[in-house]
Swiss-Prot record:
Pfam families: Amidohydro_1. GO terms for molecular function: 5'-deoxyadenosine deaminase activity; 5'-methylthioadenosine deaminase activity; adenosine deaminase activity; metal ion binding; S-adenosylhomocysteine deaminase activity. SAH is a product of SAM methyltransferases and is known to be a feedback inhibitor of these enzymes. As a result of this inhibition, organisms have evolved efficient enzymes to metabolize SAH via different pathways. The pathway found in methanogens differs from the canonical pathway, it uses the deamination of S-adenosyl-L-homocysteine to form S-inosyl-L-homocysteine for the regeneration of SAM from S-adenosyl-L-homocysteine. 5'-deoxyadenosine is a radical SAM enzyme reaction product which strongly inhibits radical SAM enzymes. Keywords: Hydrolase, Metal-binding, Zinc. It comes from the Archaea. Catalyzes the deamination of three SAM-derived enzymatic products, namely 5'-deoxyadenosine, S-adenosyl-L-homocysteine, and 5'-methylthioadenosine, to produce the inosine analogs. Can also deaminate adenosine. The preferred substrate for this enzyme is 5'-deoxyadenosine, but all these substrates are efficiently deaminated. Likely functions in a S-adenosyl-L-methionine (SAM) recycling pathway from S-adenosyl-L-homocysteine (SAH) produced from SAM-dependent methylation reactions. Belongs to the metallo-dependent hydrolases superfamily. MTA/SAH deaminase family. The keyword Zinc applies. This is 5'-deoxyadenosine deaminase. It catalyses: 5'-deoxyadenosine + H2O + H(+) = 5'-deoxyinosine + NH4(+); S-adenosyl-L-homocysteine + H2O + H(+) = S-inosyl-L-homocysteine + NH4(+); S-methyl-5'-thioadenosine + H2O + H(+) = S-methyl-5'-thioinosine + NH4(+); adenosine + H2O + H(+) = inosine + NH4(+). CDD domains: ATZ_TRZ_like. Homotetramer. PANTHER family: AMIDOHYDROLASE-RELATED DOMAIN-CONTAINING PROTEIN, AMINOHYDROLASE SSNA-RELATED.
C-alpha cells in the first residue's frame, strides 16, 4: 500500500464500544492511532472532523449489486411471482456489460450512503469485481448457483464458480474475495450443495446462501426432503462458521440452536422481508442464543435502495412492533449489527475504530435540522440519520468521498450508463 497518511481531527467517535471524542490517524490502509494528542503535522492529509461523527464503515452482508438496474420494475408482489414472472425473465437477458453498469451504480450508491464493505451474490461476477476495484470498496463476491436438479447445469455452475475464484479471489490488494453462492436449498440440488460444502472446505471459502426466507420455501423443502431448510442444509454440510445465511425468517427454536451451534452468520434483511411480505426474522431470539446477526439490504429491486441507515432503523422498529416490546433491539445493538457484526461475518478486520483495524471509516455531518439537538449519537445515528448525511468515506485507507464529493468514478457517466442498460433490459 502507498496511501498517504490521513488525520481526522476532533470528531466524536461512535463504534460498538461506545461514544468518545478523539482524532484518528490512518497510515497506509489501517488505523494507526486514536487519541487527543495528535496534531496536523502528523499526517499528509488532514480532515477537519469538528461537528461531525466518525463511525466504522457500514457492512452490507447480503445484496445483489447489479439489481440496481431492476429498481422499480416489479413492486408490490409476493416473492414467488416477483421472481418467476419478472426478475428471472429479466435476468435471462443479462450480460457482463449490464452487470458492470449496475455494479458501478450500486457502488456509488453505497459510497454515498456510508457502506464500505458488502457481500454480493449474482452473475458475471468478474465484471462486478472490476466495478468494485474501480470504486475502491471492499467486498465478498459469489456466483449465484442454481441447477434445479439438472446435472449439466450443476456442472456448469460449479465451473463458473471455480473460474471466479481463480480470476478474482484476492483482487485489488485483497479487498475483493470470493465465496461460494448456492442460491438456496430449493433451487439447488443435494449434489450441488454437497459439492459446494466440499469446495468451501478444501479452499477455506465462505458460503453465501438464502435460507428460510418464506413459508413457501420451508414447505417446499419439507415436502422434497422431509426436513426443514436448516435441518437439510446441516445434513448436507453447508452450515458452519464460514456460512452467511440470508433472511432466516421462518425458524423454529431448535433451528436457532442449530445455527448457534454451527456458528452460522445470519444476515437480516428487514426492508426486503417487509416489502415482499416474507415475514419477520426472530432477530431478538437469534441474538439471545449468541448467533452473529448482521444487516443486509438485499437487492435494490426488493428494497428499493442500498441505504444501510434505513436498514438499521427498520430492523429496530420491526422487532419492537413484532414483539410489542419497545426495548427490543435498541439502537446500539442494531448499530453493532451494521458494523462489527457485519465485519465479523465477512471475516474483515474492521468494524471498530481502534489502532490496527482496517481504515474503513465514515464521517457524518451532524449539523442538520433532523439531527438537532445533537445529544444522543447512537439514537440519532440509528433513528434520525440517513445515507444523505454521509460527508466523507474512507475504505482501505483511501478517500472515496470527501465533503460530499466523489473522488472515484464519474457519477454522471455511470448514471447514464446504468440508465441505458436498464432501458435495454426492461424496456
Amino acid at each position: 500500500m502507498d496511501n498517504e497518511s490521513i488525520l481526522i481531527t476532533g470528531p466524536e467517535i461512535l463504534d460498538a464500544g461506545g461514544i468518545r471524542r478523539g482524532s484518528v490517524l490512518i497510515e497506509d490502509n489501517r488505523i494507526a492511532d486514536v487519541s487527543n494528542t495528535l496534531s496536523p503535522g502528523d499526517a499528509d492529509t488532514v480532515i477537519d472532523g469538528t461537528g461531525k461523527l466518525l463511525i466504522p464503515g457500514l457492512v452490507n452482508t447480503h445484496t445483489h449489486l447489479s439489481m440496481t438496474l431492476f429498481r422499480g420494475i416489479a413492486d408490490d408482489l409476493p416473492l414467488d411471482r416477483w421472481l418467476n414472472d419478472h426478475i428471472w425473465p429479466a435476468e435471462a437477458r443479462l450480460n457482463g456489460d449490464y452487470c458492470y453498469a449496475g455494479a458501478l451504480l450500486g457502488c456509488i450508491e453505497m459510497i454515498r450512503s456510508g457502506t464500505t464493505s458488502f457481500n454480493d451474490m449474482y452473475f458475471y461476477m468478474d465484471h462486478v469485481a472490476r466495478a468494485v476495484e474501480e470504486a475502491g470498496l471492499r467486498c465478498v463476491i459469489s456466483h449465484g448457483m442454481i441447477d434445479l436438479g439438472d446435472t449439466e447445469k450443476m456442472t456448469a455452475e460449479l465451473r463458473e464458480s471455480r473460474r471466479i475464484i481463480k480470476e478474482c479471489h484476492g483482487m485489488a490488494d485483497d479487498r475483493i474475495r470470493v465465496a461460494l453462492g448456492p442460491h438456496s436449498p430449493y433451487t439447488c440440488s443435494e449434489e450441488l450443495l454437497k459439492e459446494t460444502a466440499a469446495l468451501a472446505d478444501k479452499n477455506d471459502l465462505m458460503i453465501h446462501i438464502h435460507v428460510s426466507e418464506t413459508e413457501n420455501e420451508v414447505s417446499e423443502v419439507s415436502r422434497s426432503h422431509g426436513m426443514t431448510p436448516v435441518e437439510y442444509l446441516d445434513e448436507v454440510g453447508v452450515l458452519g462458521p464460514r456460512t452467511v445465511a440470508a433472511h432466516c425468517v421462518w425458524l423454529k427454536d431448535w433451528e436457532i440452536d442449530v445455527l448457534a451451534e454451527r456458528d452460522v452468520k445470519v444476515s437480516h434483511n428487514p426492508s426486503s422481508n417487509m416489502k415482499l411480505a416474507s415475514g419477520v426474522s426472530p432477530v431478538a431470539r437469534l441474538l439471545q442464543r449468541g448467533v452473529n446477526v448482521s444487516l443486509g439490504t438485499d437487492g435494490a429491486a426488493s428494497n428499493n435502495n442500498l441505504d444501510m441507515f434505513q436498514e438499521m432503523k427498520t430492523a429496530s422498529l420491526l422487532q419492537k412492533v413484532n414483539l410489542e416490546d419497545p426495548t427490543a433491539l435498541p439502537a446500539m445493538d442494531v448499530f453493532s449489527m451494521a458494523t462489527l457484526n457485519g465485519a465479523r461475518a465477512l471475516g474483515i478486520d474492521a468494524g471498530l475504530i481502534a489502532p490496527g483495524k482496517l481504515a474503513d471509516i465514515v464521517i457524518l455531518n451532524t449539523r442538520r435540522p433532523h439531527l438537532t439537538p445533537w445529544r444522543n449519537p447512537p439514537s440519532h445515528t440509528v433513528y434520525s440519520a440517513s445515507g444523505a448525511d454521509v460527508d466523507t468515506v474512507i475504505c482501505d485507507g483511501r478517500i472515496l468521498l470527501r465533503d460530499g464529493e466523489l473522488e472515484v468514478l464519474e457519477e454522471k457517466y455511470v448514471m447514464e450508463l446504468a440508465e441505458a442498460a436498464a432501458a435495454e433490459l426492461t424496456g
